[in-house]
Amino acid sequence: MTVTIRKLHPHFFGEVSGVDLRNPLTPQQARDIEAGMDEYAVLLFRDQGITDEQQLAFALNFGERETSRGGTVTRKEDYRLNSGLNDVSNLGKDGKPLPRDHRTHLFNLGNCLWHSDSSFRAIPAKFSLLSARVVNPTGGNTEFADMRAAYDALEEDTKAEIEDLICEHSLIYSRGSLGFVDYSEEEKQMFKPVLQRLVRTHPVHGRKSLYLSSHAGAILGMSVPEARLLLRDLTEHATQGEFVHVHKWTVHDLVMWDNRQTMHRVRRYDQSQPRDMRRATVAGTEPTVAQQAAE
C-alpha cells in the first residue's frame, strides 16, 4: 500500500493513510513515514487496533527503544505494562483509575505541562508513538506545538540572544512547578539535571527549532529568575494558537511525534474515568551538547 499524508495544520501535523500497523512495514513505507516526520513533525494514524507488540515493532523501524528507567517514580514491581511500552494512563496495576492522592498520579500530572519527552535525559528521545486504547469521555485532548515555526517567528535579535544558550533539564523542575517536591535520595540522583541546547538544528533538513520543555529550569550563565523569565516568555510565544494543533482522541488513534521539533501537553480530564494510553519511545542517538556536571 502507498503511504499518503494529508496536512491538517498550516505549519505541521499530517494524517496518514495507506498503512495497516498490524502488519510489518515495507522498507519503502518506513522511508516514507520517516520523511513525513521530517516534514510534518507529527503524524496521525487512525483506526489502528494494534497490540503492544505490534506498536513496538512499528516503532523499531525508526531506531532503538528507549527504556523507561529514570522517567517515573513508579516502582518496577508496580508497573502495569511489561511489554516495553511506557504507561501513559491513569490506571494502577489493578486496571482501575489511581486514587487522586496516589504518588504516581500526582507525579503524572506533570504531563499536563508543555514538554518534550525525555528532555531530562542526556540523550533525549527522537520519536514518541502514543496509542489510544481507552479514551476518557471528557477532556484529555493532546495539544502539539511546532517549535520550528515558533523559532522562525522570533525577532532576529532574540534568535541571536538564544543561539548558544544551554539549559538544565530535570523532572524535578517540571514537577516542582506543580508542588511535587518530595523525593527519595535515589530519585534525586536519578533526576539530576542534564544539559540541552535551547536551539536545535534538525539533522536532515537543517531547520532550527526551539528546544523548550517544562523540564527546563535553569540556563548556564544566568541567574535562575532571569533564566526562568526567558524560558517562560519563549514558551508563551511558542504555544500561541497559530503554532498549536489540538488532537481530540478516538479509540485506536496512534499519534507519532518528533520530540526534536515539537512540544506537547495533555489537557485536564475526569481522573475518575479510565484513560489507557500506551507509548513507544524511540531513543535519540546523540546529546544536544556535551554533558558536564549540572549541579
Model-assigned labels for residue ranges:
Residues 2-256, 260-295:
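Fe(II)/2-oxoglutarate oxygenase catalytic core
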